[in-house]
Amino acid sequence: MANTTKTRTHLIGGFFGGLTSAVALQPLDLLKTRIQQHQSQSIWSIVKNSKGFSELWRGTLPSAIRTSLGSALYLSSLNLMRTAIAKSKTNYNDGASKSSLLPKLTTYENLISGALARGAVGYMTMPVTVIKVRYESTLYSYTSLSQAVKHIYQSERIPGFFRGFGPTLVRDAPYSGIYVLLYEKAKEVVPKLLPRKFIKFDKHGSYLTSTSTLVNSTSAILSACLATTITAPFDTIKTRMQLEPKRYTNVWFTFKSIIKNEGILKLFSGLSMRLTRKALSAGIAWGIYEELIKLNKF
């Protein structure tokens, strides 16, 4: 019963962390998709040509579904995997730091567990990702999610819902592996860099909620920035393949086509939007997740 409750706690923490970040940051995701779609439009021109302020939240429902469920599945799967690895050691320790209750692993173990968990969950949520990207773009005039599902199925059948999984996997698996690795390292370094007045302890020697939230969110933001920059080209390739599947048929062709026709810097188009969104999303989601885990410890 304890294991079930613990897993449920991670599911709930991941769900609400992902849901909050998805709704709050949807405009950044939409702008990133449209910047990658168009070769010359600026952020300002896209905003100016939008059909009102609410247009910036177009695609929020599929985004919220994908992010909340994906985050819940990912974080609970990641925890199960990391806990199993940690328990297999003779010197098992279920608390990584004063700011966290997550297991402490080696650099290599954090990298591998993060990548494997993300790859598996990414495949399960791929259909929602495809619907979200097309719903956000201006290439498709979908008026409802059901219309998007029907159109994709009629024109591309089941494979259409998994369009772009290759570059998505190549982007998300390394991203998550690198992120988890950096995040765990950052939680050790950030407290040493913060002014002493921000570091406060409770009677048990753990950080107060305000301190742990600051440490965890700051660590998440810094880690997300670096991991996002490294994997940015695959995000552009993924988006092109999902928006124009008949033109961009595979990862290698898409990569060569973008470099030949638009230049290597185009592979990093939308990076500012993705960087901002991923950093803020990580800060919000992991900050909420870590604290909910502590509140619901059994």
From Swiss-Prot:
PROSITE patterns cross-referenced by the UniProt entry: SOLCAR
GO cellular component: mitochondrial inner membrane
Cellular compartment(s): Mitochondrion inner membrane
Pfam families the record matches: Mito_carr (PF00153)
Positions of Solcar repeats: 5-84, 105-189, 211-295
UniProt GO BP: glycine import into mitochondrion
Catalysed reactions, semicolon-separated: glycine(in) = glycine(out)
Keywords: Membrane, Mitochondrion, Mitochondrion inner membrane, Repeat, Transmembrane, Transmembrane helix, Transport
UniProt main location, coarse: mitochondrion
Intrachain S-S bonds: none
GO MF annotations, alphabetized: glycine transmembrane transporter activity
Bilayer topology annotation: Multi-pass membrane protein
Family that this chain belongs to: Belongs to the mitochondrial carrier (TC 2.A.29) family. SLC25A38 subfamily.
Name under which the protein is recorded: Mitochondrial glycine transporter
Organism whose genome encodes this protein: Vanderwaltozyma polyspora (strain ATCC 22028 / DSM 70294 / BCRC 21397 / CBS 2163 / NBRC 10782 / NRRL Y-8283 / UCD 57-17) (Kluyveromyces polysporus)
